[in-house]
Amino acid sequence: MKKLLSFICLCLPLLATAQTTISVNTDRVIGKIDKNIYGVFMEPIGRDQEPPIENNVYGPLYCPGTPNANADGFNQLYIDAFRELQIPAMRWPGGNYVAGYNWEDGIGPKDQRPVRKDLAWGGYETNQVGTDEWVALNKAIGSENIICLNLGLGDINSARFWCEYTNVDHGTYYSDLRAKYGHPEPYKVKYWGLGNEVDGYPWIMGHKNADDYVKVAIEAAKALRAVDRSVQFVANGSAYYPDGTWAEWNRKVVEGLTGIAHYISIHRYWRDGLDESRADDYYSYVGEAAADFEEKIMSVKAQVDIQKALHPEKRSLMLSVDEWGAHGAAGIKNVLAGAMCLNSFVRHADFVKMGAYTMATGLLASDRESGQYYKSPWFYAYKMFSTNCLGESFDTYVSGDTFSSGPYDNIPYLDATAATSEDGKTLFVTVINRHEKDAIKADIQNVGKNAFAAGRVNVSSIEGGLDDTFTYAKRDSYAPKESTVNVARDGKITYTFPAHSITQFAIPVK
């Protein structure tokens, strides 16, 4: 029997109709959007290479001695792109990589740093990019550091010494060592991940069951807080789903770490939830995968809400989706999926407070033939959210035609959210048309006490052919198309959304 998908605050389960309406209710605030939902993630992933190695860190991002490198050896083109996107935070150094990582290998004179075998991905790690380099990169971007601790093969002493190195002013062995290496001022790293994918027993080094993980995480948090009481923690939620134990893992983590950690993480890559027989089907990709992504968020929220009811005296956990990515497709289909992930974060602004897109380098495209970097439609779609949707998120629902995909019914073709700018002066309504072939005409209205004011509204749209390949040669065509649309006297906007497109309306707030 199929599950009936209820997109809470998104759609009404109606029969297919000819008329589609997007209703925004600015009287119903979902929550304040945390800018950290637009964070990114990086880890060095190589494949059985001997030095000199090249992976998504060494080569593209860290490229000393090349024309694009800044004084610290990082690609200035990426730094400029991340600054334009206003990237708020970067999670590093892993990922699976961190389960075999010793942070002390990555400090001190570079010619004295050891080369290690990468236990997670194969190949070798030269440790030329370590703590001081990552911090310098984030300083150049203007982003926060989110350090993921090694609670796989690592130990708690190593974790607390890492915090001592980054956060203590002076007077201890590791804080003085940091100063000796040229960094007298502490980095004051605020966010610390309590391990990575420790539930993933088929792949992770140092796998633990949920009970053992909670015990280690509690002690690690206790140790780091003794070093710096201002730090915040991200508990390791589910990343392994096939055996069906993910919900039980999350339940135990929520029960054990509520009041200790500040966030619980989940990892979800867009195509991972699809059966291989449907993985290449268009509507499975934009429908079933989207519903699965929403379902994972709502399932964890339900567990957190239960714990809140049982222990109202404890600080509730918030969600960090600190690995996500719309992989498994190319071109505009990939962009649609990424935008749907971001729409989900906005839609659940009361609960999703942190995110980390995987990998950060995917936000700036590179042409395989020419080696040139350029801004693809995905860059511009990300920018629509990260620079605009920063205020409050509002209840938004769609009535209109729907479709079925996998075990899910009543998925609306239009996926819509509404959020204000950081200053509250503009309401951004972001709409994704998931229909493979058809444009959809819809009315947009504010059903709150203040209807949209009559006048012209700016519109930005991203679209493209499903078979189109993004290239450097076509880079000038990828910026959003800009237009205006009229708000009628009755406060409605009528607009026709192109098939497989992303559209954002910038509506002045009265």
Model-inferred region functions:
Residues M1-T20:
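Bacterial Sec-dependent N-terminal signal peptides
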Residues Y269-E288:
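Active-site His/acidic residue clusters
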Residues A18-A247, V254-Y263, E294, M298-K510:
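Non-catalytic accessory regions flanking glycosidase/transglycosidase catalytic cores in CAZymes
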Residues I266:
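Histidine-centered catalytic micro-motifs
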